[in-house]
Curated annotation (Swiss-Prot):
S-S bridge residues: C21-C69, C35-C84, C38-C122, C46-C100, C50-C102, C105-C112
Gene behind the chain: FSHB
Superkingdom of source: Eukaryota
Protein's name according to its UniProt entry: Follitropin subunit beta
Lineage of producing organism: Eukaryota, Metazoa, Chordata, Craniata, Vertebrata
Signal peptide: 1-20
Length: 129
């Protein structure tokens, strides 16, 4: 009986203390090459923890897939980048996560590297608010 109570308390602690994979507000920096500066945009993305494990013995017959907190559903929003030249396309479309889950990192749509550029990277010197 004591082990059941201990297990129950551990599960309650984990649910309260450990953030699971969920939507969160972030600020990203976007740039248009034609406009030569960056702007900051508030959007929604997925963040949190997913249960994972790294086995000591690697079984080649069973792939070791690490799960990450990633989007399940996306919507796209478009913003007009101010100050672009008249002939330049001043519209920028960016993803907004609407639902999250723990799953395999899809390198076709996500930067799965350990050290990516980060959401505030700008290749130009000038930032506009």
């Amino acid at each position: 009986m004591k082990s059941v109570q201990l297990c129950f308390l551990f599960c309650c602690w984990r649910a309260i203390c450990c953030k699971s994979c969920e939507l969160t507000n972030i600020t990203i920096t976007v740039e248009k090459e034609e406009c030569r500066f960056c702007i900051s945009i508030n959007t929604t993305w997925c963040a949190g923890y997913c249960y994972t494990r790294d086995l000591v013995y690697k079984d080649p017959a069973r792939p070791n897939i690490q799960k990450i907190c990633t989007f399940k559903e996306l919507a796209y929003e478009t913003v007009k980048v101010p100050g672009c030249a008249h002939q330049a396309d001043s519209l920028y479309t960016y993803p907004v996560a609407t639902e999250c889950h723990c799953g395999k990192c899809d390198s076709d749509s996500t930067d799965c590297t350990v050290r990516g550029l980060g959401p505030s990277y700008c290749s130009f010197n000038e930032m506009k608010e």
